[in-house]
């Protein structure tokens, strides 16, 4: 008897409330078509209105509520006019990533037919790579402090944290992913010519890990020139692995090079499956367009496809569902309807319904 996967669906803020229903609509259709065993529960917290009412982003027992799920399907968080971003993010999304040890962040980058590319002369097939970001340590630590506030001697100190365990496990994941891809190529982002302690350590661990994967062609590139090459030579990349900060930058730049962040998905994984993994669009909550019904749901839907592939863990039904959703997305982008960010006039629901119809 096959396992029933439990999914917690959390809309969050802003357009998360608009795109999540379309993602759920597609998941329900995929479950029917490919006989998937999914149990979805919608939870109404981890958003700024909840904070305004309760003084915190999530209930005290959030960990206990969520730990029994297999995945979290998340919209977006943040509404800075209501709650400062550092409160909303550290009180929800970053808690999920760290407390559930979702140390791998995966962000695929692909240029689809029908999406206008801002890079001259690029066509579908030229841009198809994956950014692997370390998701739990690195530059985004809470280690630091502020002293002598209000005086001319005021200073702040923010520390980065790179552990051998943390660095090695993200590098291992990236090299193993590269082994599954036809090009078998990996690029490691660094800045060891300017950051004199943590980045040389990152380089050292990368070289040691690479020695275990002799079939992988790899190189390291400093983050500044790497960003330039994303724009100038995106076709040279296959798997790109980076620290938390550098991965954050690259995984927004990549989709922008492919035309729009509006269709970019991400996965926050605990590869060992001890805790639920989280799947979300790269785009934020976009309060400025909330309520206009023009948010592109494709990133949410594509994130759902990533979730099915991860949950299936080799099950052909779940892989077929992932591939089928991606094919439907490609057709809708090429044939319409599409939302204004892609140059169309379709609504959020128009796009969601069209993808369901394609399935």
Locate each region found by the language model.
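Glycine-rich phosphate/diphosphate-binding loop of Rossmann-like nucleotide-binding domains
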Residues: 8-25, 29-31, 151-224, 236
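Glycine-rich phosphate/pyrophosphate-binding loop and the adjoining helix
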Residues: 136, 142-188, 192-195, 315-320, ...
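Short glycine-rich or small-residue beta-strand-to-loop segments that form or flank ligand, phosphate
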Residues: 6-15, 73-78, 186-192, 305-309, ...
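N-terminal beta-loop-helix "entrance" segment that forms/cooperates
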Residues: 35-59, 230
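Buried hydrophobic packing segments
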Residues: 23, 27, 206, 300-308, ...
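Glycine-rich phosphate/nucleotide-binding loop
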Residues: 51, 230-335
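Buried hydrophobic positions in well-ordered alpha/beta secondary-structure cores of metabolic enzymes
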Residues: 13-16, 70, 132, 174, ...
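N-terminal glycine-rich phosphate/adenylate-binding segment common to multiple enzyme folds
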Residues: 50-157, 245-247
């Amino acid at each position: 008897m096959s396992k029933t996967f439990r999914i917690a669906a959390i809309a969050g803020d802003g357009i998360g409330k608009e795109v999540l229903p379309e993602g759920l609509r597609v998941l329900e259709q995929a479950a029917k078509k490919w006989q998937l065993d999914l149990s979805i529960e919608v939870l109404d917290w981890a958003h700024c209105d909840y904070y305004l009412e309760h003084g915190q982003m999530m209930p005290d027992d959030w960990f206990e509520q969520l730990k029994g799920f297999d995945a979290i399907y998340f919209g977006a968080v943040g509404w800075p006019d209501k709650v400062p971003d550092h409160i909303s993010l550290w009180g929800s999304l970053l808690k999920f990533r760290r407390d559930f040890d979702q140390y791998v962040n995966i962000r695929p980058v692909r240029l689809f037919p029908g999406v206008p590319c801002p890079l001259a002369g690029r066509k579908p097939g030229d841009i198809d790579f994956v950014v692997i970001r370390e998701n739990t340590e690195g530059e985004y630590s809470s280690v630091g402090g502020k002293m002598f506030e209000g005086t001319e001697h005021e200073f702040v100190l923010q520390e980065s944290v790179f552990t051998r365990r943390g660095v090695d496990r993200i590098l291992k994941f990236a090299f193993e992913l590269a082994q599954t891809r036809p090009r078998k190529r990996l690029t490691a982002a660094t800045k060891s010519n300017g950051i004199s302690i943590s980045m040389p350590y990152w380089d050292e661990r990368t070289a040691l890990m690479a020695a275990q994967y002799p079939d992988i062609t790899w190189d390291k590139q400093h983050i500044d020139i790497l960003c330039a090459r994303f724009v100038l030579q995106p076709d040279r990349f296959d798997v790109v692995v980076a620290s938390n900060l550098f991965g954050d930058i690259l995984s927004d730049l990549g989709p922008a090079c492919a035309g729009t962040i509006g269709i970019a998905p991400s996965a926050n994984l605990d590869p060992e499956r001890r805790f639920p993994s989280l799947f979300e669009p790269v785009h934020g909550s976009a309060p400025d367009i909330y309520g206009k019904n023009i948010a592109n749901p494709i990133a949410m839907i594509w994130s759902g496809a990533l979730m099915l592939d991860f949950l299936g863990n080799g099950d052909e039904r779940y892989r077929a569902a992932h591939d089928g959703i991606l094919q439907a997305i490609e057709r809708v982008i090429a044939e319409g309807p599409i939302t204004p960010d892609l140059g169309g006039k379709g609504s959020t629901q128009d796009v969601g319904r069209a993808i369901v119809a394609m399935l």
